[in-house]
Structures are given as structure tokens and as C-alpha cells.
A protein has these predicted regions:
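Active-site nucleophilic cysteine motif
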Residues: 312-319, 348-364
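Alpha-helical solenoid scaffolds that mediate protein-protein interactions
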Residues: 41-42
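Intrinsically disordered, low-complexity N-terminal segments that are enriched in acidic
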Residues: 27, 47-50, 60-267
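Acidic low-complexity segments
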Residues: 18-19, 26-30, 35, 236-245, ...
Length: 484
């Protein structure tokens, strides 16, 4: 391979792994030393053979290994910003949110796998959103909450009503208007402008990508109603990750925004209600490194779950059941820092919507069932959040949906009929921007993205460097949601 100019393509080599010494330093949380070891390896001279026996057949080094090291270096640089709370700080954060929380309780939760943590420079640190996982998914912690709990009853009632309508009428539709935007945070912009002036420039050169609704089977009558300023490019309606793109030289900070509307239609499908064709298609059944990979652990799990089963619909149902009944919802760090997502999900039995979707997709593909990614926003009255889900294909019916995280949520709520609903069907409260995982933008973003795999809130590149974390400021809002 030749090293791609798009740094996000380097992630396809992530599974090349780390040298043993760097791997041990990473596991122990000594990130600065690990970065130093990586830098030393990247600087090695490969023009001469290590054993002095003639010309080296790889005079520039092993390109896949070099790409993996460059990605791992950036992962190591970003990890400390994901795991920010010492144990004492984590206890104090929980004590401010629930009654009677103790250090012993935190450590018990760590041992049980309910609190995500890592070592950072030798000190145990908890994930920045660990408290949200506990309060949002564990009724015992919700009952100890200080102050009123969010009302989930109305949302559950809407899901029941939507399910009933879809069963009765075969589909449900909604007309939706969303406004969204992204830009640099003020602090990041001021720092970038100061660097530019120190280099003799008067402005920060910005490139911005904002997700837009894409043309797909469920989305129609898409209207791009307003932009804060004309985009330099709007990607094709059927782009795998559709965006509006701006490029500008800024002397003062500003956000780039869009308002759009569309009709979303969710058809009802029961994958077990028809007889599958004896021969199924082979598209969307391959591996896509670094995450959709047929590891021995996943092959073994898929074989166990489908033992004695020949129907592709029943195989897919068993994968869905395994995930929705076993994988506990956990907020995740940035996907940038995650490795081997489906294997970790299947073994650790925890993850968020995207983690569960990737696990379902990979298990389906191992079993020869076409499966693919879809993502964007989950929208509704007063609601607009990021969301991912999966699609799978069984002839003669065609593409159907699997929303494993919603299914797991319904399992926790004791709503078995709704859990089954999300195997085959979803709901119209969606905005689909991405129809493929790990797809390039149009035009491509060459620097590291905040998320090299998905695009839900947008990406910003300043003076050639991709921004992430608190360097960007994004918003999204559902302006109207009308059931049709």
C-alpha cells in the first residue's frame, strides 16, 4: 500500500497492532512514554537491513505498521481527555447527583464493569460520562437521584402508539424540520488566530462539514431550506456520508448552520413472517477493517448462536436477541480511541447504539447475511440526539432494520413487544445522514476527524488540522415534528 493523504484512511491498518513495549505502556496508562517510543520507531532508518545483509526490501518500513503507529499515537494523545475523573472526583460527582454514594460503591461498580476506567499516567481515571450511564440505565441509581428525574413515560407512550400504528397501517411517517450548526469554540479560535498571526497570517483557514439528510428508501421530499452562508459544496443526495461543506478564512469566529426538512417513513416489517429465498445475495457480507472484522471470538459466537439454524431470518433474530438481552447500554468514549469494537462488545457485554449496531452487522456478515450501517439523528418533539442503527437484507423482502440499542432499552423496561418491534422495524423519528460506516466526505477531510467512522454533528479543520473535543462547538434542534 501507499500511505493515503487522507489520515482517516490510516485507520484501516489499526489492527496491525502495537509493538509489545508500547502496548504495555498504553495498558498501564503511561501515554507520554508510549508516544515517545512510537516517535522513535517512526524515525528509524530502514534503508539498511537490520542484520546488515544487503539492501532492505522494505526501505521505507512497513507501511501498514507505520499507519497503525500514527493512528495509535493520536489515540494516545486523545485518551486523557476522555478519562478525566480520579476516583475521588468520581465519588464527588456522584455524590452531587445521588444520595449516599461512597468510594467502596464506586470500586464495586468498577469491578462489575459498570464504570469505565483507564490508567492515565499511572492513575486510575473514570470516563467523563460514567455518571450518565449509571443514572440513565440503572433504576436503583435513578431512584437515588437528587432532584426530579426525566419523564420517560411520554416517550414510551409515543413508541407504543407508533408501533400500534405501524402494525395497523404498515408504516408511520413524519414531516420533520431540523436546524444544526458547527464551528470552532471561542477559545480554540482565539488560540488558532494567535498562531496564525505569529506566522504572519491574518486569518484562520477553516474547512467545515455539516451532516445533511441523505436520499434513501425511508427519506423523501428533502428540502435544504436555509444556510448561514452559501456552502462551497453540497454532497450528492445519495452520498454515503452527506454533508454541506464550507471553506473560509476567518478573522472573527462564526458558526456554519443549516436548516432542512424532510419526510421520514418507517415501514413495518416482521422478518419471521415470510419464507426466505433459498439463495441469498452476497453483497455487504465482507470485512471492513478495523472494526467489521471476523475475529475468532466473533466467529465462535456466531456459530454458537446459529447452531442448528438454517434460516437467515432466524440467525439474524438470534444475533439481535443476544445483543438486546445481554449488552448493557454504556456511554462510550470517542470512537476515535476504540479498537475492535464488535469483539469487545460481545465479550464485555456493554456498549452504546453504534457499538451494538456494529456488533449486529459483523455477526450477520459472518453468517452470510448482508448488513450495513445507518446513522444520523434521533428526532422528535423536543428531542434531537445522535443515533446509529443497522440494516440487514433477506430476500425476497429486502432491507429491514435492527435498532439494537432501542431494543435493549425496551428489554430493560420490560416492553417485550417493543423490543421485538426494533428487529425489522424502526420509527419515523430519524434523520439519515450516513448510509455507510467509515466513508470519506465530499470533498475529503485530510486531517484526522473527530470521528473517523461516522458523522452526526459535523467536522472542522483549522489550518489543516482536524479539531476534536472542546475545540469545536456544535448544536442541533428539532424545530418541528408533525406526524402524518
Amino acid at each position: 500500500m501507499t500511505m493515503p493523504a487522507d489520515q482517516n484512511e490510516w485507520f484501516r491498518c489499526l489492527n496491525a497492532g502495537l509493538p509489545d513495549d508500547v502496548s504495555r505502556l498504553k495498558a498501564a496508562g503511561y501515554y507520554e512514554e508510549a508516544i515517545g517510543r512510537i516517535d522513535a520507531r517512526l524515525a528509524e532508518d530502514w534503508t539498511a537491513s537490520q542484520n546488515g545483509a544487503g539492501a532492505n526490501p522494505a526501505p521505507a518500513g512497513v507501511e501498514a505498521q507505520r499507519a497503525a503507529l500514527l493512528v495509535q499515537r493520536e489515540i494516545l494523545r486523545r485518551l486523557p481527555a476522555e478519562y478525566i475523573y480520579t476516583e475521588q472526583q468520581a465519588v464527588e460527582k456522584m455524590q452531587a447527583r445521588v444520595t449516599g454514594f461512597t468510594l467502596e460503591e464506586l470500586r464495586a461498580l468498577e469491578r462489575a464493569g459498570w464504570v469505565d476506567w483507564r490508567f492515565v499516567e499511572g492513575e486510575k481515571r473514570c470516563l467523563d460520562r460514567f455518571d450518565e450511564t449509571l443514572l440513565d440505565t440503572d433504576p436503583a441509581f435513578a431512584a437515588r437521584r437528587r432532584g426530579p428525574a426525566p419523564d420517560s413515560g411520554a416517550a414510551l407512550a409515543r413508541r407504543r402508539a407508533t408501533h400500534a400504528k405501524m402494525v395497523r397501517e404498515g408504516a408511520a411517517s413524519a414531516r420533520i424540520t431540523v436546524e444544526a450548526g458547527i464551528g470552532m469554540s471561542d477559545a480554540a479560535f482565539e488560540a488558532a488566530l494567535a498562531r496564525a498571526r505569529a506566522q504572519g497570517r491574518s486569518a484562520v483557514h477553516l474547512r467545515v462539514w455539516l451532516p445533511l439528510p441523505a436520499a434513501c428508501a425511508s427519506q423523501s421530499d428533502i428540502r435544504l431550506e436555509h444556510f448561514s452562508e452559501p456552502p462551497a459544496r453540497i454532497a450528492a443526495a445519495d452520498a454515503p456520508q452527506r454533508t454541506a461543506y464550507w471553506e473560509a478564512d476567518l478573522t472573527a469566529n462564526r458558526r456554519f448552520t443549516a436548516r432542512y426538512s424532510y419526510t421520514q417513513t418507517a415501514p413495518y416489517a416482521d422478518p419471521l413472517s415470510f419464507v426466505p429465498d433459498p439463495v441469498q445475495p452476497a453483497f455487504d457480507t465482507g470485512e471492513e477493517a478495523p472494526h467489521i472484522v471476523f475475529t475468532p471470538a466473533l466467529r465462535a459466537l456466531a456459530a454458537q448462536l446459529t447452531r442448528g439454524v438454517t434460516s437467515p431470518a432466524e440467525k439474524a433474530r438470534r444475533f439481535y436477541d443476544y445483543i438486546t438481552r445481554n449488552v448493557h447500554y454504556h456511554y462510550q468514549p470517542s470512537y476515535f480511541v476504540l479498537e475492535d469494537i464488535p469483539t469487545r462488545c460481545a465479550m464485555d457485554r456493554r456498549g452504546d447504539c453504534g457499538v451494538m449496531a456494529l456488533t449486529f452487522i459483523t455477526l450477520c456478515r459472518i453468517a452470510g447475511i448482508p448488513a450495513r450501517w445507518q446513522s444520523g439523528l434521533a428526532v422528535g418533539p423536543g428531542k434531537c440526539g445522535c443515533h446509529d442503527w443497522a440494516m440487514f437484507y433477506i430476500a425476497p423482502r429486502g432491507w429491514m432494520y435492527a435498532d439494537c440499542s432501542y431494543g435493549a432499552s425496551m428489554a430493560r423496561a420490560g416492553e417485550e413487544e417493543l423490543r421485538r418491534h426494533y428487529f425489522g422495524s424502526i420509527d419515523p423519528g430519524r434523520m439519515v445522514a450516513n448510509r455507510a460506516f467509515q466513508a470519506a466526505f465530499d470533498p475529503p477531510m485530510l486531517g484526522f476527524r473527530a470521528d473517523p467512522y461516522d458523522n452526526q454533528t459535523g467536522e472542522v479543520e483549522a489550518d489543516g488540522a482536524g479539531l476534536w473535543g472542546e475545540q469545536t462547538a456544535a448544536f442541533k434542534e428539532t424545530l418541528s415534528y408533525e406526524e402524518l
